[in-house]
């Protein structure tokens, strides 16, 4: 799928999950065992008591899976490339997730990502699936681009009619 996912130990998460902007001076210990001091406006994922992830960059040590993990929460999300790039640069964090989000991930692939990951995990490890929780607060809307058939034909070196172009697009 070429899209980042993150898996949390669900039993280490307390209460509801919130995605918010960090406050200057907040601390976060990543999966790399490094402590990071955050600036204002870095996107973080939190439970009711703590930051559990730098969104789209690095998961937190406090919610990581280990040999005792029994229940998991899979995150399949879309984060804005500019936000990921800015936070990653400021904190000097390199990760596969950062690399992919910075270059753009299809926002429409979140559902396919979580479905595939869920199937693989249950096939390999067993267990039961629960509901998918979806945050619809910032649903991406389709963009419409006006383009003439003359322009398309000029670029492609063809003589396609309007009807055929509309069918293929």
Regions found by a protein language model. Give the residues of each.
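RNA/tRNA-interacting regions in translation and RNA-turnover enzymes
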Residues: 1-169
């Amino acid at each position: 799928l070429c899209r980042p996912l993150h898996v949390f130990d669900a039993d280490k998460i307390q209460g509801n999950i919130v995605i918010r902007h960090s406050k200057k001076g907040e601390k976060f210990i990543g999966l790399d065992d490094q402590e990071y001091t955050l600036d204002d406006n870095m996107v973080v994922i939190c439970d009711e008591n703590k930051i559990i992830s730098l969104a789209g960059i690095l998961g937190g040590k406090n919610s990581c899976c280990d040999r005792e993990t029994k229940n998991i929460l899979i995150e399949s999300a879309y984060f804005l490339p500019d936000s990921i790039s800015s936070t990653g640069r400021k904190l000097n964090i390199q990760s596969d997730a950062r690399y992919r989000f910075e270059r753009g991930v299809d926002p429409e692939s979140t559902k396919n990502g979580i479905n595939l990951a869920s199937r693989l995990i249950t096939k390999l490890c067993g267990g039961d699936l629960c509901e998918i929780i979806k945050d619809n607060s910032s649903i991406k809307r389709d963009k419409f681009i006006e383009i003439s058939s003359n322009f398309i034909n000029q670029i492609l070196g063809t003589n396609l009619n309007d009807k055929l172009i509309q069918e293929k697009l």
